[in-house]
Swiss-Prot record:
This is tRNA (guanine-N(7)-)-methyltransferase. HAMAP family: tRNA_methyltr_TrmB. InterPro entries: SAM-dependent_MTases_sf (IPR029063), tRNA_(Gua-N-7)_MeTrfase_Trmb (IPR003358), tRNA_methyltr_TrmB_bact (IPR055361). It comes from Vibrio campbellii (strain ATCC BAA-1116). It catalyses: guanosine(46) in tRNA + S-adenosyl-L-methionine = N(7)-methylguanosine(46) in tRNA + S-adenosyl-L-homocysteine. Its EC number is 2.1.1.33. The active site is at residue 143. Keywords: Methyltransferase, S-adenosyl-L-methionine, Transferase, tRNA processing. Catalyzes the formation of N(7)-methylguanine at position 46 (m7G46) in tRNA. GO terms for cellular component: tRNA methyltransferase complex. Pfam families: Methyltransf_4. One of its GO terms (molecular function) is tRNA (guanine(46)-N7)-methyltransferase activity. Pathway: tRNA modification; N(7)-methylguanine-tRNA biosynthesis. Substrate binds at residues 147, 180, 217-220.
Length: 239
């Protein structure tokens, strides 16, 4: 995933703000991934267009919508969609081989409640996701930018939290984060505690046990065997 910074200007040409985002990184598709992209994109892919999506039109029903940013190769997202047919899932990933792999797995699993996008997540949120429409926003194992001088590049910042808040359903919507970097977990808690309109739903302390709905990945299982921790965090939109 690559990061870019663009400037936004007003009509007078004065810069209003800097926008940091994460954009599509091209990679080499395998033949299987390319085949899945070609075959499945017409039914499961959503092209970027600066217009708000209508979830009923997208999925053909009014089921709750779960959106994941940065699903990697998509195995856990496909598993979640397969295990919860009563929900609709949409994944945004900038790495095209990951999108192809996800579509291939989804086709093999025979699921119909999953859609994917290959575009900048911030642009999608700003122009395509209706306010107050998401039941859950998932952000699993984002780049930790572990060097201190790079912490400002972490996706979880106050402006990102506010963007998420606007898209979640009031008094219901959940922002679910997971990381295997303790320092990033602490950073997430610090940011979310400052972000207005959110409450941590952990019963004790700041973190929750891994929820059953989040599949245990091979990478995570290996980390457990090596003694590495994983921190799950859930905040609910309250205002």
């Amino acid at each position: 995933m690559s990061e870019v910074t663009t400037n936004e200007y007003n009509e007078d040409g004065k810069m209003i703000r800097k926008i940091r985002s994460f954009v599509r990184r091209e990679g080499r598709l395998t033949k299987g991934q390319e085949n899945a992209m070609n075959e499945c994109w017409p039914t499961m892919g959503i092209d970027y267009k600066a217009e708000l999506l209508d979830w009923k039109e997208v999925f053909g029903n009014d089921n709750p919508v779960v959106l994941e940013i940065g699903f990697g190769m998509g195995a856990s997202l496909v598993e979640m969609a397969k295990n919860a047919p009563e929900k609709n899932f949409i994944g945004i990933e900038v790495h095209s081989p990951g999108v192809g792999a996800c579509l291939a797995d989804a086709r093999e699993a025979g699921i119909t409640n999953l859609r994917v996008m290959c575009h900048d997540a911030v642009e999608v949120f700003e122009h395509m996701i209706p306010n107050g429409s998401l039941a859950t926003l998932q952000l699993f194992f984002p780049d930790p930018w572990h060097k201190k001088r790079h912490h400002k590049r972490r996706i979880v910042q106050l402006e990102f939290a506010e963007m998420v808040r606007q898209k979640l359903i009031l008094n219901e919507g959940i922002f679910h984060m997971a990381t295997d970097w303790e320092n990033y977990a602490e950073h997430m808690i610090e940011i979310m505690n400052q972000a207005p309109g959110f409450d941590n739903i952990a019963e004790e302390g700041d973190f929750i046990p891994r929820p059953e709905e989040r599949p245990l990945t091979k990478f995570e299982a290996r980390g457990h065997r090596l003694g590495h921790g994983v921190w799950d965090i859930k905040f609910k939109r309250t205002a």
